[in-house]
């Protein structure tokens, strides 16, 4: 999910 990509 997006929080893993930041």
Swiss-Prot record:
GO terms for biological process: defense response. It comes from the Eukaryota. It is found in: Secreted. Its main location: secreted. One of its GO terms (cellular component) is extracellular region. Expressed by the skin glands. Keywords: Amphibian defense peptide, Secreted. Putative defense peptide. Belongs to the frog skin active peptide (FSAP) family. Tryptophillin subfamily. This is Tryptophyllin-3. The lineage of its organism: Eukaryota, Metazoa, Chordata, Craniata, Vertebrata.
């Amino acid at each position: 999910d997006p929080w893993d990509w930041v």
